[in-house]
Amino acid sequence: MQDEERYMTLNVQSKKRTSTQTTQLTFKDYSVVLHWYKILLGISGTLNGILALALISLILLVSQGVLLKCQKGSHSNTTEHEDIGDLKMNNGTRRNTSNKDLCVSRSADQTVLCQSEWLKYRGKCYWFSNEMKSWSDSYVYCLERKSHLLIIQDELEMAFIQKNLRQSNYVWMGLNFTSLKMTWTWVDGSPLDPKIFFIKGPAKENSCAAIKESKIYSETCSSVFKWICQY
């Protein structure tokens, strides 16, 4: 009986000792795992930081390359536009086109999509008619095609239009004399900047602007000419 009690006591003590050792091993293993987890987490953070820096550097290099490419092409493009010739403008209004303007226009050219038979230039689309209509009918025609009559903003655009006219006839543009404002006004509501070009002819009610060769003329709006749509 005593031997049996001694055996049971030893057995219980052995189980307690084994349980304690197992618990200690579990805590020890957890500490090791936690230690390596922290190390791996640190390595992962470092790698992510390196990748982020590499990506930023790559973006900067690409941006500098695009800018440099635009700058290199600026001189040749300016010469090309000068060779085209331009419409008659006020004295002293010619200005140099900056590299930034050229780069922006190239970027716009890459994103804009023009319909068939439309010409693309500096982020805009142009359509040159073969028919002849009055100024108001030309205006409506462009609106129906989700566009508007030609609005010229600078000498480069004027040179582009002149290059593509290829005719000596009058062509309507989106400019008319409004009696309400008593000034030449574009179809978008903005007034004509007199520094851009001269308008040859009277500035009076029922007068609309038309391009012919290298000049802008004031003509009666009911006259029938070809026209240019733009969007």
From Swiss-Prot:
A GO MF term: carbohydrate binding
Processing and modification events after translation: Phosphorylated on Tyr-7; this phosphorylation is required for NKp80/KLRF1-mediated cytotoxicity.
Bilayer disposition of the protein: Single-pass type II membrane protein
Phosphotyrosine PTM sites in chain numbering: Y7
Cysteine disulfide partners in this protein: C142-C229, C208-C221
Extracellular side of membrane: 60-231
GO biological process: innate immune response; NK T cell activation
Glycosylated position list: N77, N91, N96, N176
Role of this protein: Functions as an activating receptor involved in immunosurveillance upon binding to various ligands displayed at the surface of myeloid cells. Upon interaction with CLEC2B ligand, stimulates NK-cell cytotoxicity and cytokine production leading to the cytolysis of malignant CLEC2B-expressing myeloid cells. Actviation of the common cytotoxicity pathway involves SRC and SYK kinases.
Subunit relationships: Homodimer. Interacts with CLEC2B.
Identification of the protein by name: Killer cell lectin-like receptor subfamily F member 1
Organism encoding this protein: Macaca fascicularis
Gene: KLRF1
